[in-house]
Amino acid sequence: MEASLDDLKSELRSIVGAADIVESGESLETLSKDYYWYSPVLKRQLEEKRADMAVRPGSVDQLSAVVAACSRARVPVVPRGAGTGNYGQCVPLYGGVVIDFSRLDKILSLEGGVARVQAGARLGTIESEARKVGWELRCMPSTWMKSTMGGFFCGGSGGIGSITWGGINAPGNVKSLTIMTCEDSPRLVRLEEAESLKALHTYGTTGLLVEIEMRLAPKVDYDQLILSSPSWDTLLDWTHEAAKRLEWRKRLVTQFEWPIPSYFKPLAKYLRPGDSVTFLLVDKAQTAEVVAHAAKAGVACVYNRPLTDPPKPPFITDYTWNHTTLWAIKADPTITYLHSGFGPNFRQQFA
């Protein structure tokens, strides 16, 4: 096995160059991990797992040559975007080669309301470039400034924007994707429309995602609002109504019960101790209407900042989705989370 790995390393060096192969040290450890440690179960299972090497192909041809070499050597490969997932999808269970997609990051086109990009393109870059030409991403994770399109499609499901457009698997969001097969002579396979969802959330097990076309949404100028109430039920009633109001152009609706907001230290001066809060991204042309509607319901707006264009922090999205867990862990490392789903009768389910 060692001789085989040594031979493979030599071949991979000849393909990508010595500067784009990582064989040891902290860099290899980093490229072998994601945020799996959010889960105490995965932390125990995965903390000793790592790749034998990592490579950074800079073209589709280099990627094909790397995959072919690994296939011939019968060495497992694991694709990696930015490593911002929480479930260990990019952690190699059996050593082998991590393929880092960070150099395959081109935005190939932004035309007709469709982004055509390589798998390693960062969502933050796509969002910024799309907004320049009147568009924005339909949905993206809270890690959007760092995450890649390939990582989001293969390891994510939804996020900011899903309140309006649904998750990645909602009809029409994905136009097409191109996958590279893992075999001695790799092939490129194009899947279109609903067929492309066969590869959704499969972490590369169905092949390596090379290129993706995602439909975009018309650009909206947003305000970032935090709404507050000492009553969870009062806030929930208002937030639920806000979420259902189709005439309000929204990108985020997230409610937090106290003491969760106490973990958001950078926002402490805006938050009222004991209050539950709702974070809202809404069309700035509708902000006054939304704030007035909330006030009539007994809900106060305690934070109102525009989302700049191009987007620059601070972002209230940095406290939503799985970022919430990250802030909680900073306060108490023993905290983790469970996903729960609720139906239209969620109030009865709470009881």
Regions found by a protein language model. Give the residues of each.
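FAD-binding subdomain of flavoenzyme oxidoreductases
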Residues: 106-108, 119, 123-124, 128-247, ...
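Short, ordered loop/turn segments at secondary-structure junctions
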Residues: 82-84, 142
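Generic non-transmembrane alpha-helical segments
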Residues: 7-19, 65-73, 129, 238-246, ...
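Short, well-ordered beta-strand elements within core beta-sheets of diverse protein domains
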Residues: 53-58, 223-228, 278-279
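Short, surface-exposed ligand-recognition loops at beta-strand->loop->(often short) alpha-helix junctions
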Residues: 2-3, 227-235, 339-348
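C-terminal substrate-recognition/cap domain of FAD-linked oxidoreductases
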Residues: 31-34, 240-351
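N-terminal flexible segment immediately upstream of the FAD-binding catalytic core
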Residues: 1-68, 84-113, 260, 264-266, ...
